[in-house]
From Swiss-Prot:
Protein's name in the database: Late lactation protein A
CDD domains: lipocalin_1_3_4_13-like
Secretion signal, residue range per the UniProt entry: 1-18
Function field: Probably serves a role in the transport of a small ligand released during the hydrolysis of milk fat.
Annotated InterPro entries: Calycin, Lipocalin, Lipocln_cytosolic_FA-bd_dom, von_Ebner_gland
Species annotation: Notamacropus eugenii
Keyword Glycosyltransferase: no
Gene3D superfamilies linked to this entry: 2.40.128.20
Similarity annotation: Belongs to the calycin superfamily. Lipocalin family.
Keyword terms, alphabetized: Disulfide bond, Milk protein, Secreted, Signal, Transport
GO MF, one annotated term: small molecule binding
Domain of life: Eukaryota
Subcellular location: Secreted
Tissue distribution: Mammary gland specific. Secreted in milk.
């Protein structure tokens, strides 16, 4: 569940622009975004690997921050997750806040509306790195994927630890 939470969090990070523009100057479209592919640099327990991911819904808040919503389903229970996203003073970095506070790098691909997120966090006492490619639809974009693979090779991720999650509909407590 924690890995899925981080996975979705990372996806949301990528919605924010990768350049040094101020957060208020770049406003990605509100709407739905999809995690295309995920890479991790460490082995994960099989039950923690995010295989199914719901779409992310992005909206702007009155305070200039963004909110990202998605759902997770585990053990037949549905939970809606709300994250707050905020640009920070460091170039190409954003924070996400729910219970924990994470800082991630955002990298723009050569394709419009496709981003790579790269975060470091702790999982079961070990630091892990995770990178995700996020885009505006579920269609495979070869150029964005090529950028992602170049990025993970440059950052020395192991290609056998790449996950292509299945896109699922958001769950509700009624259909859990």
């Amino acid at each position: 569940m924690r890995v899925l939470f981080l996975t979705i969090s990372l996806s949301l990070f990528s919605i924010i622009h990768a350049d040094d523009f101020a957060f208020s100057e770049f406003k990605p479209s509100e709407g739905t975004y999809y995690v295309q592919v995920i890479a991790v640099d460490k082995e994960f327990p099989e039950d923690e690997i995010p295989r199914d991911i719901s779409p992310l819904t992005i909206t702007y808040l009155n305070n200039g921050k963004m909110e990202a919503k998605f759902t997770v389903k585990k053990d037949n229970n549905c939970e809606e997750i709300n994250l707050t996203l905020e640009k920070i003073d460091e170039p190409r970095k954003i924070t996400t806040t729910r219970h924990l506070h994470h800082i991630c790098d955002t990298v723009r691909t050569s394709e419009e509306k496709y981003w790579i997120l790269s975060c470091v966090r702790e999982f079961q006492g070990t630091q892990i790195r995770e990178a995700e490619l996020v885009g505006p639809n579920t269609d495979e974009n070869p150029k964005a994927l090529e950028d992602f693979y170049r990025f993970i090779n440059r950052e020395r991720f192991v290609e056998r630890r790449i996950i292509t999650p299945r896109q699922t509909e958001a769950c509700t407590s009624e259909n859990a």
